[in-house]
Structures are given as structure tokens and as C-alpha cells.
């Protein structure tokens, strides 16, 4: 894909998505679907396999940090706040301390949602538009109460990230090119 092709198609891609989407994979999927539609009308995609089979690196996080998680939560919270407010961005370990100063339910909203910290988001959003993601995720976490952290993460991803991003993006980019994208999961 040349830079010219990218920019020429970007507005069309946004049109076909029907709503603002900040996932750059939509662009690659559009061009891939365009090429595939020249030869076939239906394709099988592997979308959903990472969520089902634990293929994302983030799913290893709870297992990798069990020792740190033995530190009492009030101390971890204090370390997380210290890291957020006192350590400059880019400091090694800052993100780790910030993430582990929160419970899984507080920090994990679905794959790839860590663009802004809550404090950063509040700085750029209009009053009254503060992130209220936990209102969306709380019922999901309640359904998997008592399950291990990885299962909880997968469940949230399957009900938010997979449905409202990955599968939708593949379907819309395929249909934009008269291609049916089927998923086996």
C-alpha cells in the first residue's frame, strides 16, 4: 500500500465503518478485502482465536506478576499513585506500578485501552464526559466473579473488544468490498 493509496482511501474507509474508529487495522483489512474480493466472495478469518485461546501477551500478565501481587493492595495503590504523579513518562517500571496499583477490574477494560491514563483522559475531555468505562465492565466482571484473572480478561475481551471492534471491523471492511468474512469462533 503506497502512501497515496492510503490517503486516497482513508475517507472511504471511515465512511464504510459508519462510526469513528481509531483502529489502524481497519485500513489494512480494507485493502486485504479489496484484493481477496478479486478472486473469491467468501473468506474464513481467524478473528476471535486470540480471545478464545489466550493469544494476547496481556493474558500472561497476571501469571508473570504473582509475587508483586502478594504486596497488600493499599501499598500497591500508594506505589501506583506515586508512579503516576511523581515519575516522568517513559520511566522504566512506571506503567507496571500504575497498573498493579489497581485491581484487575479497575485496570482492565478490554484489550488495547491503555492509550491514556484516567487522569490524562480527564484533562482532555469536556466536563461530564469523564470515562465511565467501569459502568460498562462491571456487569461483565460480576458474571465471572470467582474466576481466575485470565478468564476474566478473556470474558471482557469477548464481550467488548471482539464484538465492538474486531468482528465489526472485519465485517464492515469485507462488505465494503463485497466480500463476506466468516469467523470460525
Where are these regions (language model features)?
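Short alpha-helical scaffolding segments that buttress acidic/His motifs in well-ordered protein cores
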Residues: 10-14, 156-162
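A short, charged helix-loop
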Residues: 131-143
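Structural motif
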Residues: 21-22, 144-157
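Hydrophobic alpha-helical segments with strong N-terminal bias
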Residues: 2, 30, 141-149
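Short Ser/Thr-interspersed hydrophobic loop/turn segments at strand-loop and sheet-helix junctions
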Residues: 158-172
Amino acid at each position: 500500500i503506497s502512501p497515496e493509496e492510503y490517503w486516497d482511501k482513508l475517507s472511504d474507509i471511515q465512511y464504510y465503518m459508519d462510526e469513528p474508529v481509531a483502529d489502524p487495522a481497519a485500513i489494512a483489512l480494507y485493502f486485504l478485502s479489496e484484493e481477496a474480493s478479486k478472486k473469491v466472495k467468501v473468506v474464513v478469518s481467524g478473528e476471535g482465536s486470540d480471545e478464545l485461546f489466550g493469544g494476547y501477551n496481556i493474558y500472561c500478565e497476571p501469571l508473570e506478576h504473582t509475587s508483586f501481587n502478594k504486596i497488600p493492595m493499599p501499598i500497591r495503590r500508594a506505589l501506583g499513585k506515586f508512579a503516576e504523579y511523581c515519575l516522568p513518562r517513559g520511566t522504566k517500571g512506571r506503567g507496571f506500578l500504575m497498573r498493579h496499583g489497581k485491581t484487575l477490574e479497575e485496570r482492565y477494560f478490554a484489550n488495547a485501552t491503555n492509550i491514556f491514563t484516567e487522569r490524562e483522559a480527564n484533562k482532555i475531555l469536556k466536563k461530564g464526559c469523564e470515562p465511565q468505562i467501569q459502568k460498562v465492565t462491571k456487569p461483565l466482571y460480576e458474571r465471572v466473579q470467582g474466576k481466575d484473572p485470565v478468564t476474566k480478561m478473556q470474558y471482557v475481551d469477548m464481550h467488548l473488544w471482539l464484538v465492538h471492534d474486531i468482528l465489526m471491523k472485519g465485517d464492515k471492511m469485507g462488505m465494503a468490498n463485497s466480500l463476506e468474512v466468516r469467523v470460525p469462533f
